[in-house]
From Swiss-Prot:
Name listed for the protein in its UniProt record: Uncharacterized protein AF_0069
Superkingdom assignment: Archaea
Amino acid sequence: MSEFKLGDIFGCEAVKNFGAALRKALRIGDDYASLVELEYVETKEQFEEVIKKFLRRYETIARRGYKGKELSRLSEKDLEELMSLVDKYDVKPIRAALISYALVKSEREDEATLKSEEVV
């Protein structure tokens, strides 16, 4: 495993996009299974399998949508970039970044909160 800076991982668009999708799956679809499975991933093979299962679940959640609109899907580019990061840095830091992004509030949520507070 090569030396890296956390910013190399946390700043990656693919990590941000997958983390945001995991956040939506948790909050909209109550998909805690994906979070738990991801938490215990140790190998590249396990990571690959967990991502496959997550994508299958997320597809169902995205089709159902939220407030009448379908959720955006992850791209092939995001998937390829995520797997390249795992090859480069190993599973644990990528896993930590995905879970971290899934559990934080997005900037969009902050903006929505501010707008709703202004209305009140």
